[in-house]
Amino acid sequence: MAMKINTGEFHERVEKGIHNTFMRGAVAGAQERLRTRRLEAAQELGNWEEWRALGEEIRQHTLENLDYYLMQLSENVKKRGGHVFFAQTAEEANDYICRVVASKQAKKIVKSKSMVTEEIHMNAALEKLGCEVIETDLGEYILQVDDHDPPSHIVAPALHKNKEQIRDVFQQKLAYTKTEKPEELALHARAMLRQQYLTADVGITGCNFAVAESGSITLVTNEGNADLVTALPKTQITVMGMERIVPTFEEMEVLVSLLTRSAVGQKLTSYITVLTGPREEGEVDGPEEFHLVIVDNGRSDILGTEFQPVLQCIRCAACVNVCPVYRHIGGHSYGSIYSGPIGAVLSPLLGGYDDYKELPYASTLCAACTEACPVKIPLHELLLKHRQTIVEREGKAPISEKLAMKAFGLGAASSLLYKLGSKIAPTAVNPFTTNDRISKGPGPLKAWTDIREFPAPEKERFRDWLKQRGNE
């Protein structure tokens, strides 16, 4: 389990996000840039929808045969001299990782970006063991230095910070003395991290795709930090969600093309690294010992259900980058490691409805996420399924909602009441109307109009408009 992050009630987190004007501006700007780059990169292929269909087919086939490919992966990793551990829960994964680290008497660990290790709270488990865990992805490193600020985006974890804020963090925590120029900040971070690579006992990575036919893992990065994490420490541990697997390199090539274009609008990232087991005789770098931890943590419960398509996700965040709700509330409002539309679908499945039942309602159901997804996950439909499940689980709707729906039903079913309502509505709301917008709504409308305007009813009814123009 281990996923819970939420701090405060959902509506409190949302209100905080909405009133964070810098964050909203940063998110809006990033969404526009990433969306534009994604569309341009997709257009270069010329047949993007065919690529999406192929990506969907690959992911569906893999999930339908997941047990076979996981066994094939395990066998091939072991043939190459690696160790494989299947973890049913977050606790089992952390226990195994801690045992490996303790057996090496390791005290310093370098780590590349990994969502699944965030999901299982691996860093906290290792720190309890007395280890120092250093994030080497620049965004994650910034957040770690800033008192473990949680990530706000799947691909760009420090999206909610600007260069001045990062400069201040570095000045306070890393004795930084230069300006807020990104180049200078990056150089300082690189200098701080370089020594950590050289003195680390263990390297830990995530996994973009594991290749079943060879027992390889693939890491897709732009910074090169993952290469150093895997090349220098004597022991490497890779942690992957059980669904992050492809049958062969042929499928991997397709999904990497979709991933890089959808995530950051690039044909390819700067580094695409394929690692197969520990260092072999004659090789000059790489780990002496390799461990692959395959994490379930609720994923097997999703298989075979109507929510199975969510496991097709390749963690590109294209859905996040087009979501209008994310644009206004930011990633921290979700209170989960996984934000945006994919987080709203995945979090209740992995962490339970008790902690994440509000997230499926953090959506306009505009389907922009579904349209952007490179593997065609029907995200807006899955959000609706969540809502249905929540209503059935709760057993009843709030009394206020029941009364409102009943009143609307009575009015809509009666032509007399409907005519009367449409006639008096403009007059009834007139005291609350300014420039054809209700800015201070009465009763249940107040919660809406406190943060956004509500369109006022038209003064002229459609029936009257049509009657006047019927003879034209």
Curated annotation (Swiss-Prot):
Binding site for [4Fe-4S] cluster 2: C323, C366, C369
Superkingdom of origin organism: Bacteria
Pfam families the UniProt entry points to: Fer4_8 (PF13183), LUD_dom (PF02589), LutB_C (PF11870)
Gene Ontology BP term (one): lactate metabolic process
Residues forming coiled coils: none
Key words of the record: 4Fe-4S, Electron transport, Iron, Iron-sulfur, Metal-binding, Repeat, Transport
GO MF annotation terms: 4 iron, 4 sulfur cluster binding; metal ion binding
Role this protein plays: Is involved in L-lactate degradation and allows cells to grow with lactate as the sole carbon source. Has probably a role as an electron transporter during oxidation of L-lactate.
Protein's name according to its UniProt entry: Lactate utilization protein B
Native source species: Anoxybacillus flavithermus (strain DSM 21510 / WK1)
Highest classification ranks of the organism: Bacteria, Bacillati, Bacillota, Bacilli, Bacillales
